[in-house]
Amino acid sequence: MDISDEESEISESEIEEYSKTPYHLLRSETYYKVKVNGRLRCPFCVGKKKQDYKYKELHAHATGVSKGSATRSALQKSNHLALAKFLENDLAGYAEPLPRPPVVPPLLDETEPNPHNVYVWPWMGIVVNPLKETDDKELLLDSVYWLQTLSKFKPVEVNAFWVEQDSIVGVIAKFDSDWSGFAAATELEKEFETQGSCKKEWTERSGDSESKAYGWCARADDFQSQGPIGEYLSKEGTLRTVSDILQNNVQDRNTLLDVLSNMIDMTNEDLNKAQHSYNRTAMSLQRVLDEKKNLHQAFAEETKKMQQMSLRHIQRILYDKEKLRNELDRKMRDLESRAKQLEKHEALTELERQKLDEDKRKSDAMNKSLQLASREQKKADESVLRLVEEHQRQKEDALNKILLLEKQLDTKQTLEMEIQELKGKLQVMKHLGDDDDEAVQTKMKEMNDELDDKKAELEDLESMNSVLMTKERQSNDEIQAARQKMIAGLTGLLGAESDIGVKRMGELDEKPFLDVCKLRYSANEARVEAATLCSTWKENLKNPSWQPFKREGTGDGAEEVVDEDDEQLKKLKREWGKEVHNAVKAALVEMNEYNASGRYPTSELWNFKEGRKATLKEVITFISTDIKNLKRKRT
């Protein structure tokens, strides 16, 4: 749906409801600002001719638009209704802004010209120079000469003519058609007038008057005169009054202002529509983020419930195991008590002795069977405990995997524990029960059937898990191949100045070496010494016979760390300081983690902002957003 469709959905009755969103945005000054540089303005009419308002003017403007005619869109009305509420509730005490300085119109000659005072336009000046016998006629007819002579009036063009009937040289200087040209032409006339050589003196001169140059502005009588001067003026110019030119300029300016005002109004309307669409999109995005947060919270709660259920199941198994162990101990005590009673009796006859021996033999056999059953039970218990611990560890490692694999793994673990429990119970039943006891045989058969069902179910789960693990390994292989291709493609393109880039893991940082050498040597010697020292330690890092590591911790928690007591490291720290020592130590840790067998630096995708290995998702996101900006900066 485009913006026009969204506007059409806002009815007159919904204007009050839709004004709430721009009202909150005005209060927070997130998108709209009413106060700009200490002045009040309408944020929804940016670009209008009137920008600065007094408080009452702006309030009247907002109220008028919100209750305007049908030509106003519902979006405009809702926005200006929000502005009116904002002024009433939040800016009621705002001081009146300083008035803008008035625009001073250009100073013009306020004296209206007489009807006969009509000028030639574009503005022109006339200079006539009677020719004396001593004058150089060819020089006076040179336009370049007159252009230099009249240069202080800045004419754009000068033309010289020979007027045969008056034996004079006529010069016409053309000026700019704007008011600066008019000022230059009148300045030329005033210059000759102060010298007593204007048009009036030229027309009133006597025959034997002094031969000198005369000058004035070209007017209607000059335009209508005969001769080369009149012909040139009628060809190159027209007759205009100052008021006509001023009126035409005002009309042109007003026309231009109207066109620009309409363009600004249309642009403001489009801007308001785009702003409204942006606000709706921002609100939709916020709802999506809230839903995502709720889903994440629900997933965390579900995971917690599953962990609690697994813990209760393990506790039940341990309780049943303890119960079986107590029952075995009780039966062993009963047998021992019976054996002691049998030993006290003396056989009076051989038959009784034989019977007593037979009872002892059976008692010993039963005792051995019980001991064997106890050992089997103990083994089963230990197996169950180990299995519980192993499953618990696997479960903690698999919490970050997909939920389907987690449920299947929990089911498999439960089946394995039940199978181990059934095996333990069967071993106990075999050693305790009598082969002729039908109830025992029936119970053992049921347990065997249940055990077979559990094994079959376990095999199905293992088959499914095997398929999933195969897919996971394939995915891991593809991910590693993708990482290598990204490393090859981004190497040299990105560096530590960007958030995501390629880092050489295990590469020695040369800066600490250069810093410490600058403190001991001159500038040139420091570079040489730093390069030599750094090269030496790069070779030491590549030496596989040097293993400055030790193991800390026990069992699965043991890890390799740098041995601070290594002689070479201790010597390096004494001679070159802690910073150089830490640089070598950091390179050792990275090399031991990423390429312990090869002992040479390797490339890795790195998140420089957080100081850790970057995920493929982070790299892809960075490429899609920041690489374009980076390329534009480089071009």
Curated annotation (Swiss-Prot):
Disruption phenotype: No visible phenotype under normal growth conditions. The double mutants idnl1-1 and idnl2-1 show a late-flowering phenotype and reduced level of DNA methylation. The double mutants fdm1-1 and fdm2-1 show reduced level of DNA methylation and repeat-associated small interfering RNAs (ra-siRNAs). Residues 289-471 form a coiled coil. It holds the Pfam family zf-XS. Residues 350-376 are annotated as: Disordered. Forms a complex with IDN2 and FMD1/INDL1. Forms a complex with IDN2 and FDM1/IDNL1 that is required for RNA-directed DNA methylation (RdDM) and that functions at a downstream step of the RdDM pathway. This is Factor of DNA methylation 2. It comes from Arabidopsis thaliana (Mouse-ear cress). The gene is FDM2.
